[in-house]
Amino acid sequence: MKGNYLVIDKRVLPDVYEKVVFAQKLLKDGKVKEITEATKIAGISRSVYYKYKDYIFDFAETSQGKKVTFNLIVKDQTGVLSGVINYISEQGGNILTINQGIPINGVANISVTIDMSTLIGDIKTLLNGLSDIQYVEKIEFVAME
C-alpha cells in the first residue's frame, strides 16, 4: 500500500483538521486568493495550515476514479437488491462485484465493489442515497483503492 492512510470519521478529530480542509476549499473555489485570508476565515494560523495542508484531504475529493467496497445490511424484502443496483446505476456507478448473503433472522448482507470514476456525485452522496432506500438498515464503508 502506498503511503500510510487511515479513514477516520471527522467527529473524533480535533476541529483544526476540518478547518484546514475548509481553508483549502476556500482557495480552490476561488472565494479567497491569499492563504492568509483563507486561514483567517477558517480560524486557524498560517503555520497550522502549512503543517497539515499536504496531509489532509476531503474524502469526497480523493475518491474519484477509484474502487470502493461497502457492505449493506438490508431487510429480507422483495426488490431491495434491485433498488440498490438501480440507484448505483442511476448515479453512474459501475458495479464490479456484488454478493448477497442468505437472509438470516430477516436481514441479509450485501457486499458491493464499484468503480467510482463515472459517478455523477461523490461517494458521500452515493452512500447517503443508498441509506435512504427503503429496507436498507445500515451501510458500512469497507475499503477504497
From Swiss-Prot:
Phylogenetic lineage: Bacteria, Bacillati, Bacillota, Clostridia, Eubacteriales
Organism whose genome encodes this protein: Clostridium botulinum (strain Alaska E43 / Type E3)
Family: Belongs to the UPF0735 family.
The protein's name: UPF0735 ACT domain-containing protein CLH_2637
Pfam families reported for this sequence: ACT_4 (PF13291)
The ACT domain, residue ranges: 69-144
Domain of life: Bacteria
